[in-house]
């Protein structure tokens, strides 16, 4: 406003709930163009509504191709035939894994361009499945802890734990057949066998070979793992991948008989924060916090 004055609202677009929340009040007051979030869609499931599509479009991403990928994955996953429904098949396998004590899920893409998928997956999987009670009101303490890794970087750190540590993990390898660029490995040091054997190959082949080698090592050690392969990292494939994981999460929550779409544990922390700041309407929560047992000084260093 300091620079643009009354024209400032022409440079801001709001994405918000249509009826409630502070942002819709501000958007109406300031006259911001507004896109609305559909009712009942949580942030972690919002990639295919304006929350995800608007910033993607602004960045020049072809959102029509993303939606086509999601649509095709949806069609593929409508069958009751488990062998032909990838999201349902993956959910069944993961459910069996959880039932047998594999309570950690590692997301390990072998492409830098997919590394942020792991961050989103961690929120999606943890916030959706980490629930203390099921639909019957029974205490179940459900969930599987998501961990992010990056190939090949974390082969030299985390994979040691995955191959020789506790049998409590499922490792998901994200592979790419065709990278956006080909990086040649030049010839040189022909007299050094430990270097020369790579000459004339490509970094593309090296990355995928290391992924296959890691997959082999995990399997040889009896560690549960699965591989998901994208033909390339493009809008269509990402649309398929994002939709797959959202549906995979929904199926998994149904198998656990829990509410996949709420986050009461997160809300409790928000309420406590509001109370600590003295927000109106949270006086009872403030009293609860004030009456809670204090930290014992002898345990504070």
Say what each PLM segment does.
Residues 109, 113, 146, 202, ...:
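Conserved aromatic-histidine-acidic binding/catalytic patches
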Residues 3-172, 177-180, 265-301:
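Active-site phosphate/pyrophosphate-binding segments
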Residues 8, 35, 47, 54, ...:
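Generic alpha-helix detector with strongest preference for long hydrophobic helices that associate
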Residues 147-234:
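Helicase-primase coupling helices
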Residues 214-277:
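C-terminal helical cap and adjacent loop that interface with cofactors, partners, or active-site loops
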């Amino acid at each position: 406003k300091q620079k643009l004055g009354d024209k400032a609202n022409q440079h801001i677009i709001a994405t918000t709930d249509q009826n409630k929340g502070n942002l819709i009040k501000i958007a109406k007051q300031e006259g911001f163009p507004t896109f609305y979030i559909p009712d009942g869609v949580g942030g972690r499931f919002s990639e295919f509504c304006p929350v995800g599509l608007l910033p993607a479009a602004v960045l020049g991403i072809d959102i029509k191709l993303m939606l086509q990928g999601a649509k095709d994955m949806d069609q593929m996953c409508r069958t009751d035939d488990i062998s032909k429904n990838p999201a349902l098949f993956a959910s069944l396998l993961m459910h069996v894994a959880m039932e047998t004590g594999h309570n950690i899920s590692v997301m390990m893409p072998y492409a830098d361009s997919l590394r942020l998928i792991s961050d989103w997956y961690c929120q999606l999987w943890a916030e959706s499945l980490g629930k203390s009670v099921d639909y019957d009101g029974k205490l179940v303490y459900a969930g599987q802890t998501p961990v992010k890794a990056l190939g090949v970087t974390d082969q030299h750190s985390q994979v040691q734990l995955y191959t020789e540590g506790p049998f409590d993990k499922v490792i998901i390898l994200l592979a790419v057949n065709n990278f956006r660029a080909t990086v040649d490995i030049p010839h040189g040091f022909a007299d050094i066998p430990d270097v020369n054997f790579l000459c004339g190959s490509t970094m593309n082949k090296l990355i995928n070979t290391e992924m296959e080698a890691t997959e082999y090592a995990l399997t040889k050690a009896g560690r549960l793992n699965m591989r998901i392969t994208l033909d390339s990292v493009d809008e269509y494939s990402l649309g398929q991948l994002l939709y797959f994981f959202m549906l995979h999460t929904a199926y998994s929550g149904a198998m656990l008989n829990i509410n996949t779409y709420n986050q009461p544990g997160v809300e409790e922390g928000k309420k406590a924060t509001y109370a600590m700041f003295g927000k109106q309407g949270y006086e009872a929560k403030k009293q609860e916090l004030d009456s809670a047992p204090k930290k014992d000084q002898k345990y504070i260093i």
